[in-house]
Amino acid sequence: METKNSFISSASVKVQGRTAYYKMLEAVRQGELIQVCRGVYANIDQLSAGMVDIESIIPNGILCLWSAWNIHQLTTSMPQAYHVAIKRDRKVKVPSFPKIELHHYTSNILEIGVIEKVIDGFKVKVYDVERCVCDAVKFRNKVGIDVCSEIIDTYLSRPERNISKLMDYARQLRVGNILGNYLQVKL
């Protein structure tokens, strides 16, 4: 039984035949595979190795906040869960493992600053660095002023920073004045 990106769908195994399907069920009983959501199973060893295929678990989900800050190395804090942004009106059943926190956004805010990256062999959607800084400012009271300040300092220390793009995103996300005040103090 081959695993594609550490995930197995029961439908693809059924196509291979009854024997393959029973082997998959036996692997679940023995603890080698874990049910992520209905019809999708994952290899335990590969899940614990690092990044998981978020697209398989939550289609069209975008890594945001702590997960995105970690990917872009904007903070030294490690995320306790995968933070995934989805459309506000969408309902998604989240599996018990891996731990995923959903953040709901309106469709016009959701699409600002989305890029695709390949991380540990998985193609994932994630917010770009400028959007991540704006999110840190927007949610500064929830994540803490110290984390927000660390993210801004790290961003400003990078040679590839793009202040005009940052301010454009900040205006769209309605944090332009607040971010402007931070930048006046920091620069």
Task: Set out the residue ranges of the language-model regions.
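Active-site loop and adjoining helix of the penicillin-binding protein/serine DD-peptidase-beta-lactamase fold
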Residues: 2
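Nucleic-acid-binding surface
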Residues: 5-15, 23, 28, 36, ...
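Glycine-centered, phosphate/nucleic-acid-interacting loop/turn motifs that mediate DNA/RNA or nucleotide
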Residues: 31
